[in-house]
Swiss-Prot record:
Classification via Pfam families: Glycos_transf_2
Gene3D superfamilies: Spore Coat Polysaccharide Biosynthesis Protein SpsA, Chain A (3.90.550.10)
Protein's UniProt keywords contain Acyltransferase: no
Family as reported in the entry's similarity comment: Belongs to the glycosyltransferase 2 family. GalNAc-T subfamily.
Full protein name: Inactive polypeptide N-acetylgalactosaminyltransferase-like protein 5
Signal peptide start-end: none
One CC-aspect GO term: Golgi apparatus
Any single biological process term in GO: spermatid development
Gene responsible for this protein: GALNTL5
MF annotations from Gene Ontology: metal ion binding
Keyword annotations from UniProtKB, A to Z: Differentiation, Disulfide bond, Endosome, Glycoprotein, Manganese, Membrane, Metal-binding, Signal-anchor, Spermatogenesis, Transmembrane, Transmembrane helix
List of residues binding Mn(2+): D227, H229, H360
Positions in the Cytoplasmic compartment: 1-4
Amino acid sequence: MRNAIIRCLFYGSLTFGIWTALLFIYLHHNHVSNWQKKSHEPLSAWSPGKKVHQQIIYGSDQIPKPHVIVKRTDEDKAESTLGMDFNHTNPELHNELLKYGFNVIISRSLGIEREVPDTRNKMCLQKHYPARLPTASIVICFHNEEFHALFRTVSSVMNLTPHYFLEEIILVDDMSEVDDLKEKLDYHLETFRGKIKIIRNKKREGLIRARLIGASHASGDVLVILDSHCEVNRVWLEPLLHAIAKDPKMVVRPLIDVIDDRTLEYKPSPVVRGAFDWNLQFKWDNVFSYEMDGPEGPTKPIRSPAMSGGIFAIRRHYFNEIGQYDKDMDFWGGENLELSLRIWMCGGQLFIIPCSRVGHISKKQTRKTSAIISATIHNYLRLVHVWLDEYKEQFFLRKPGLKYVTYGNIHERVQLRKRLGCKSFQWYLDNVFPELEASVNRS
């Protein structure tokens, strides 16, 4: 009996040992296979993971690596559809809409990064760009921006921009009062140490002068201006840099996709160009079909009479050469049209690059303060008196109450126009935007 028990214990121990050994071999084999598989996967420039704080930042001496977008889990993808069935009668939502101009509740739920759909035309996927292109300084100005929207702007740039083209991101805090934009922002930006500069204005400068401050700290070949509530798309920067590399006097902007203010859903936009009317109100115009003829089709750069002010790229030295912004303009409003006219009339070109896509939250218009309204009028009048020549009467026909409103000293800007040898506004109408002159004849 005793011998039988000993034999049972012996064979039981032997069986357990064999199964343990087999399990170890199986797990080791899986580990090696996974390691070999991962070792052959290319890494993106910033190795984006699920959370920003898990990313590894490489120095500028790293060998360029191709783009790879990490696949997200079903849980992550669900984040992108938040808000489709959102209760829009929520009082908290209403208050936040008034404060920020978009759905902050969903913005917080999305967190500090997400993957957006690739909205480029399929022909864009066949394009290849040189490995040597100008470097870019990204300038993002903000005042009391919602934290998550701002950080998604930054993280999307870091995740989807090759580090060998990205000189720096310059954040200009225009005297924000929101606590989240102070120590909390600094803490999270430590993830991107070495690529981020943050400048905190000691007084409220307004968007125009804040951008000038950011540009003055830039060291990249190209200035890229972004609003503080954007999300860049795949291969967004290379098409812009490539266009500028071919023509240093070309100012370019991406196609602007819409991020819905209520749902924060990322929606593709059609190919359109920037324009304006005699009230100097910016608008989007359809592109003529003949402009997309030829082998490039819908990927061909589109001449644009004007641009909206929030997102564009310009060679830094050229920006300085043509007079930057009018520093005597206040806050924001009109600076985009003034720069558009100056580019075209003074020897440059303005194009939309369809293969570059950037999403932008189309904020709900919040109530403008009297200071903002006064600043916008002031800015428009400076534009009118410097650049419209005899056509300024078309503006005053529509805004007669502004004809005798003061607009400050424009001597410096008039002299700039003479020094640059700029063409007349009539030339602009004849060669760039004849549809605007045609509207005079119809009225």
